[in-house]
Structures are given as C-alpha cells and as structure tokens.
Amino acid sequence: MRRIDEDGWLEGAERFESPHYNERPVSDATPQTVVLHNITLPPGRFATGCVTDLFMGTLDTTADPTLADLKGLRVSSHFFIERTGRILQFVSCGKRAWHAGISRWAGRENCNDFTIGIELEGTDFVPFEEAQYAALTELLGAIHEKYALHDVVAHSDIAPGRKTDPGPHFDWVRLWRSREAFGSPAFDGAAARVQLSRLEQRFERA
C-alpha cells in the first residue's frame, strides 16, 4: 500500500509542485475531510495536459476559446486522478490547496482550511473509469493511514447551488462498499445519501 510521507506527499504519485497554495491554520494541521471533484479542460476533453497546466499556473488560455475565462485564475488541488488511474499530486497534504472556493461543511466555512481536494478527470455526463475508482480507493487508504479520515464529501455538498461535481455519474455506492479499505469514514453529504438511500430501498423491497 502506498503511504503519505512526513512532508505530505504520496509515495509513487507523479509530483508537481503548484505555486497555488498556502499554510493551513494551525488548528487544521491534520486534515480529515476529503472533497471529491471532477474536471476536464477544455470541457469534455480528456488527456490534454491542460488541468496540470491550470494547477501549475502555466495554462495557455488562448489555446481554446473555452479557456479564456480562466485567465489569471489561481487554483489547485492536492490530487488529480487521470482516466488511466495515474495519480498526480500538486500540493502537500499538509498545505492548503485552493480547490473548494466559497464553501461550508459541518458548520464551518472556508473548507480549504481543513480538507484534502481530489480531482477526478471527468465530467457530470460520463461514467468514471474502473482504474479511477481503484486509484481513489488506494489514495483514500493512504490518507486515512496518515490522518485518520473522518468523512468524504462532494464539491456539490460544500458548495450547493454553485457546484455539481463530481456529478451524478460518480458511483458513491461503489466507493461506500470499499469503505473498509480507508477506515469506514462518514458519507454524510447529499450526493452520497441520494444513492445510498436508493440502495437501502432496494434492500427493503427484496
């Protein structure tokens, strides 16, 4: 199993050191909530390298008309899982990546302070790949071993009405079924609850 080292970097991940980060508040030095996102750049296109460029601050926003609005945007995520399952890391887990935006969870605002962001290469309109679920499960296991993972939520849970990702094609039931591999955290967000409630209803009818 992969591990996260003392500096907050995942062993074996493709490492890129984004300039888009800052320090976590001292009280949030141990992040225990994971936020799941999806992203493609340009929208709907895979394996372009543009996501890496965005997080590194080197995106050519003139390369495609859909990128123009991203000019000057300074964002990052701790991790990015490509369609192949390859894991890229841009910010140490001990630092504050800029993935959540205006957000609130469990009565707290500014979710970047206390969360780890994981971007999955994908959209709201297509299923994710088997390799991505396998990589995500392994990554969550490493996060749990290092930080005692407490809960896993969607970007849409912490920014309802503003964000929709990782979207309806993300299989929360599948992730929930593998939860013992990463400490059986809570799945209390609305995105997960909708799918899990359907699972419960199927069991009740059986």
Language-model-derived ranges and their functions:
Residues 2-26, 33, 40-150:
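Active-site-adjacent loop/helix surface patches within enzyme catalytic domains
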Residues 37-39, 155:
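Histidine-centered divalent metal-coordination motifs
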